[in-house]
From Swiss-Prot:
Disulfide bonds join C7-C14. Keywords: Amidation, Disulfide bond, Toxin. This is Paulistine. It comes from Polybia paulista (Neotropical social wasp). Induces transient hyperalgesia and paw edema in mice. Probably exerts its effects via different pathways in an oxidation state-dependent way. Occurs in oxidized and reduced states which are thought to adopt a compact globular and linear structure, respectively. It comes from the Eukaryota.
């Protein structure tokens, strides 16, 4: 999914600030 792709692109931010974890 797009969320997963974005999450991989910015792993450092993933789950910290982004609404999609």
């Amino acid at each position: 999914s797009i969320k997963d792709k974005i999450c991989k692109i910015i792993q450092a931010q993933c789950g910290k600030k982004l609404p999609f974890t």
